[in-house]
Amino acid sequence: MLLPYLNKDLIEAGCDEAGRGCLAGSVYAAAVILPKDFKNELLNDSKQLTEKQRYALREVIEKEALAWAVGVVSPEEIDEINILRASFLAMHRAVDQLSVRPQHLLIDGNRFNKYPDIPHTTVIKGDGKYLSIAAASILAKTYRDDYMNRLHEEYPFYDWNKNKGYPTKKHRAAIAEHGTTPYHRMTFNLLGDGQLNLNF
Protein backbone atom coordinates (compact mmCIF):
# COMPACT_ATOMS: atom_id res chain seq x y z
CA MET A 1 0.00 0.00 0.00
CA LEU A 2 1.35 3.42 -0.93
CA LEU A 3 1.95 6.00 1.78
CA PRO A 4 -0.42 9.01 1.85
CA TYR A 5 2.27 11.53 2.85
CA LEU A 6 5.72 12.06 4.33
CA ASN A 7 4.78 15.06 6.51
CA LYS A 8 1.24 15.02 7.88
CA ASP A 9 1.26 18.71 8.82
CA LEU A 10 2.57 20.11 5.53
CA ILE A 11 0.95 20.67 2.14
CA GLU A 12 2.93 18.22 0.01
CA ALA A 13 3.17 18.01 -3.76
CA GLY A 14 4.40 14.81 -5.39
CA CYS A 15 6.44 15.29 -8.58
CA ASP A 16 7.47 12.90 -11.33
CA GLU A 17 8.51 13.04 -14.97
CA ALA A 18 7.92 11.01 -18.14
CA GLY A 19 9.99 10.69 -21.28
CA ARG A 20 13.48 11.12 -19.90
CA GLY A 21 14.92 8.12 -21.77
CA CYS A 22 13.23 8.89 -25.10
CA LEU A 23 14.94 9.78 -28.37
CA ALA A 24 12.12 12.08 -29.45
CA GLY A 25 9.56 14.43 -27.98
CA SER A 26 9.34 16.74 -25.01
CA VAL A 27 9.88 15.65 -21.43
CA TYR A 28 6.75 16.02 -19.29
CA ALA A 29 6.43 16.35 -15.52
CA ALA A 30 3.48 16.65 -13.17
CA ALA A 31 3.00 17.97 -9.65
CA VAL A 32 0.02 16.77 -7.59
CA ILE A 33 -1.30 17.76 -4.16
CA LEU A 34 -3.71 15.13 -2.82
CA PRO A 35 -5.98 15.38 0.23
CA LYS A 36 -4.39 13.70 3.27
CA ASP A 37 -7.24 11.18 3.37
CA PHE A 38 -7.07 10.31 -0.35
CA LYS A 39 -7.45 6.58 -1.00
CA ASN A 40 -7.54 4.58 -4.20
CA GLU A 41 -6.80 0.86 -4.40
CA LEU A 42 -5.75 1.04 -8.04
CA LEU A 43 -3.27 3.89 -7.70
CA ASN A 44 0.22 2.46 -7.92
CA ASP A 45 3.34 2.96 -10.00
CA SER A 46 2.00 3.96 -13.43
CA LYS A 47 4.41 1.56 -15.15
CA GLN A 48 2.52 -1.37 -13.59
CA LEU A 49 -0.91 -0.21 -14.76
CA THR A 50 -2.62 -0.80 -18.08
CA GLU A 51 -3.21 2.16 -20.37
CA LYS A 52 -6.95 2.00 -19.65
CA GLN A 53 -6.30 2.04 -15.88
CA ARG A 54 -3.95 5.02 -16.18
CA TYR A 55 -6.52 7.10 -18.04
CA ALA A 56 -9.28 6.13 -15.60
CA LEU A 57 -7.04 7.16 -12.71
CA ARG A 58 -6.17 10.45 -14.42
CA GLU A 59 -9.84 11.43 -14.23
CA VAL A 60 -9.99 10.51 -10.53
CA ILE A 61 -6.78 12.38 -9.72
CA GLU A 62 -7.83 15.53 -11.56
CA LYS A 63 -11.22 15.50 -9.85
CA GLU A 64 -10.03 14.77 -6.30
CA ALA A 65 -6.62 16.48 -6.09
CA LEU A 66 -6.39 19.76 -4.20
CA ALA A 67 -4.20 20.96 -7.08
CA TRP A 68 -2.38 19.48 -10.06
CA ALA A 69 -0.35 20.77 -13.00
CA VAL A 70 1.79 19.54 -15.88
CA GLY A 71 5.08 21.07 -17.04
CA VAL A 72 6.76 20.53 -20.42
CA VAL A 73 10.30 21.04 -21.75
CA SER A 74 10.80 20.89 -25.52
CA PRO A 75 13.36 18.80 -27.45
CA GLU A 76 15.23 22.03 -28.32
CA GLU A 77 15.52 22.93 -24.64
CA ILE A 78 16.58 19.36 -23.80
CA ASP A 79 19.41 19.61 -26.34
CA GLU A 80 20.44 22.97 -24.91
CA ILE A 81 20.54 22.12 -21.19
CA ASN A 82 20.68 18.25 -21.16
CA ILE A 83 17.95 15.80 -20.23
CA LEU A 84 18.61 15.69 -16.48
CA ARG A 85 18.30 19.46 -16.11
CA ALA A 86 15.32 19.41 -18.47
CA SER A 87 13.55 16.87 -16.23
CA PHE A 88 14.07 19.14 -13.22
CA LEU A 89 12.90 22.18 -15.21
CA ALA A 90 9.72 20.37 -16.25
CA MET A 91 9.01 19.65 -12.56
CA HIS A 92 9.66 23.31 -11.70
CA ARG A 93 7.23 24.39 -14.43
CA ALA A 94 4.59 22.03 -13.06
CA VAL A 95 5.03 23.39 -9.51
CA ASP A 96 4.90 26.96 -10.89
CA GLN A 97 1.37 26.30 -12.15
CA LEU A 98 -0.12 24.76 -8.99
CA SER A 99 -3.16 26.70 -7.76
CA VAL A 100 -2.22 25.78 -4.16
CA ARG A 101 1.32 26.54 -3.04
CA PRO A 102 2.96 23.45 -1.52
CA GLN A 103 5.09 23.62 1.62
CA HIS A 104 7.13 20.57 0.68
CA LEU A 105 7.94 18.65 -2.51
CA LEU A 106 8.27 14.87 -2.80
CA ILE A 107 10.47 14.19 -5.83
CA ASP A 108 10.76 10.83 -7.58
CA GLY A 109 14.44 9.94 -8.00
CA ASN A 110 17.67 10.70 -6.21
CA ARG A 111 18.50 14.20 -7.50
CA PHE A 112 16.73 17.52 -7.92
CA ASN A 113 17.52 21.18 -8.51
CA LYS A 114 16.08 23.01 -5.51
CA TYR A 115 12.86 24.88 -6.13
CA PRO A 116 12.97 28.42 -4.69
CA ASP A 117 11.71 28.62 -1.09
CA ILE A 118 10.12 25.14 -1.00
CA PRO A 119 12.08 22.31 0.66
CA HIS A 120 12.09 18.92 -1.03
CA THR A 121 12.78 15.26 -0.35
CA THR A 122 13.99 12.93 -3.10
CA VAL A 123 12.62 9.38 -2.99
CA ILE A 124 14.17 6.61 -5.11
CA LYS A 125 11.33 4.72 -6.83
CA GLY A 126 8.97 7.15 -5.15
CA ASP A 127 6.16 6.38 -7.60
CA GLY A 128 5.96 2.99 -5.90
CA LYS A 129 6.04 4.47 -2.38
CA TYR A 130 3.92 7.65 -2.15
CA LEU A 131 0.43 8.32 -3.49
CA SER A 132 1.19 11.87 -4.63
CA ILE A 133 4.25 10.79 -6.63
CA ALA A 134 2.29 7.89 -8.18
CA ALA A 135 -0.46 10.36 -9.13
CA ALA A 136 2.11 12.70 -10.68
CA SER A 137 3.61 9.75 -12.57
CA ILE A 138 0.22 8.94 -14.09
CA LEU A 139 -0.49 12.52 -15.17
CA ALA A 140 2.98 12.99 -16.66
CA LYS A 141 2.81 9.71 -18.57
CA THR A 142 -0.73 10.05 -19.92
CA TYR A 143 -0.30 13.66 -21.04
CA ARG A 144 2.98 12.79 -22.72
CA ASP A 145 1.38 9.74 -24.37
CA ASP A 146 -1.37 12.01 -25.76
CA TYR A 147 1.31 14.32 -27.16
CA MET A 148 3.28 11.47 -28.77
CA ASN A 149 0.07 10.10 -30.32
CA ARG A 150 -0.50 13.52 -31.92
CA LEU A 151 3.08 13.59 -33.24
CA HIS A 152 2.58 10.09 -34.67
CA GLU A 153 -0.15 11.46 -36.95
CA GLU A 154 2.38 13.96 -38.32
CA TYR A 155 5.28 11.45 -38.57
CA PRO A 156 3.83 7.91 -38.80
CA PHE A 157 7.11 6.18 -39.81
CA TYR A 158 8.54 6.23 -36.29
CA ASP A 159 5.85 4.19 -34.52
CA TRP A 160 5.44 6.85 -31.82
CA ASN A 161 1.89 5.76 -31.07
CA LYS A 162 3.43 2.56 -29.71
CA ASN A 163 7.00 3.36 -28.57
CA LYS A 164 6.20 6.94 -27.37
CA GLY A 165 9.65 8.02 -28.55
CA TYR A 166 11.65 5.38 -26.67
CA PRO A 167 14.62 3.73 -28.44
CA THR A 168 13.06 0.60 -29.92
CA LYS A 169 14.61 -1.25 -32.87
CA LYS A 170 11.80 -0.03 -35.14
CA HIS A 171 12.26 3.57 -34.02
CA ARG A 172 16.02 3.45 -34.66
CA ALA A 173 15.48 1.72 -38.02
CA ALA A 174 13.07 4.51 -39.03
CA ILE A 175 15.66 7.15 -38.08
CA ALA A 176 18.25 5.32 -40.22
CA GLU A 177 15.84 5.16 -43.16
CA HIS A 178 13.95 8.47 -42.95
CA GLY A 179 16.32 10.67 -40.96
CA THR A 180 15.38 12.78 -37.97
CA THR A 181 12.41 15.07 -37.34
CA PRO A 182 12.23 18.43 -35.53
CA TYR A 183 11.09 16.41 -32.50
CA HIS A 184 14.21 14.25 -32.19
CA ARG A 185 16.75 15.09 -29.47
CA MET A 186 19.88 15.76 -31.47
CA THR A 187 22.27 15.45 -28.52
CA PHE A 188 21.15 11.85 -27.97
CA ASN A 189 22.84 8.82 -29.51
CA LEU A 190 19.98 8.23 -31.94
CA LEU A 191 21.33 5.20 -33.79
CA GLY A 192 23.76 3.57 -31.36
CA ASP A 193 23.34 1.34 -28.34
CA GLY A 194 23.63 4.12 -25.76
CA GLN A 195 20.45 6.02 -25.04
CA LEU A 196 21.87 9.23 -23.68
CA ASN A 197 24.78 11.54 -24.22
CA LEU A 198 24.86 13.61 -21.04
CA ASN A 199 27.16 16.60 -20.83
CA PHE A 200 27.44 17.92 -17.30
Swiss-Prot record:
Cofactors required: Mn(2+); Mg(2+)
Reaction catalysed by this enzyme: Endonucleolytic cleavage to 5'-phosphomonoester
InterPro entries: RNase_HII (IPR022898), RNase_HII/HIII (IPR001352), RNase_HII/HIII_dom (IPR024567), RNaseH-like_sf (IPR012337), RNaseH_sf (IPR036397)
Top-level EC class: hydrolase
EC numbers for this chain: 3.1.26.4
Cofactor details (free text): Manganese or magnesium. Binds 1 divalent metal ion per monomer in the absence of substrate. May bind a second metal ion after substrate binding.
Cellular component, GO annotation: cytoplasm; ribonuclease H2 complex
Location(s), subcellular: Cytoplasm
A UniProt-annotated Pfam family: RNase_HII
Entries under PROSITE patterns matching the protein: RNASE_H_2
UniProt binding sites for a divalent metal cation: D16, E17, D108
Keywords noted in UniProt: Cytoplasm, Endonuclease, Hydrolase, Manganese, Metal-binding, Nuclease
The UniProt record lists the keyword Lyase: no
Molecular function terms, GO-annotated: manganese ion binding; RNA binding; RNA-DNA hybrid ribonuclease activity
One GO BP annotation of this record: DNA replication, removal of RNA primer
Annotated ranges, domain RNase H type-2: 10-200
Family assignment from sequence similarity: Belongs to the RNase HII family.
Stated role: Endonuclease that specifically degrades the RNA of RNA-DNA hybrids.
PANTHER family: RIBONUCLEASE H2 SUBUNIT A, RIBONUCLEASE HII
Name assigned to this protein: Ribonuclease HII
Organism: Bacteroides thetaiotaomicron (strain ATCC 29148 / DSM 2079 / JCM 5827 / CCUG 10774 / NCTC 10582 / VPI-5482 / E50)
